[in-house]
Amino acid sequence: MYKVFFNDSFLQVCTAPPTEKNREVKPFTTPTQMDEWINCARESSNPIHWTLVTEHPQQAWQQLIAHLPIIEAAGGLVRNADGKYLFIYRRKRWDLPKGKMDEGETPEQAALREVEEETSLTPLKISGLLTHTFHIYWLRDHFTLKRTHWYLMDYNGNKAPVPQTIEDIERAEWMNLEEFSRLQEPVFGTVLEVVRSVTAK
């Protein structure tokens, strides 16, 4: 399955209709369905969730995103010795540390750098790739697709995280997954995908 977010809306491409409600299910017919969904999501005050069903999801996905410029990014879900995970609060939503890859960086290098910059935690050790997420946003005069490589990282020190305020990060807090599930403030859909990926392991 392939999934892309635009604000709180998402479009997914898969081989069978989902069991969840509140999703509009359509057959994949044309690459322009990506733009149609974006326009619907922009004009609606509520999240718009589309599922495009096809026997060939990889081919359909490549056609849907072919016209979009892609920016590569990387980030991390950090786990401490107590089994808690580090989340940051930025722009009125809970998020995870991440950022664009610099030229010449590998995704792993970028993920470590971004987490260290945004939380001041070091040393960090990558224990594995969790997932990739996609989201679309308006950049200057066009829509852009950001692909983020997410890694599970371990931190065994006792230093408290320090939020990078220049990046609008207000808080950085350790939580177990039960505490995370009880959060009252909004959480980015991509972050929920990352958390689901670690609970599925």
Where are the language model's segments positioned?
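Acidic, metal-coordinating catalytic segment for phosphate/diphosphate chemistry
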Residues: 31-75
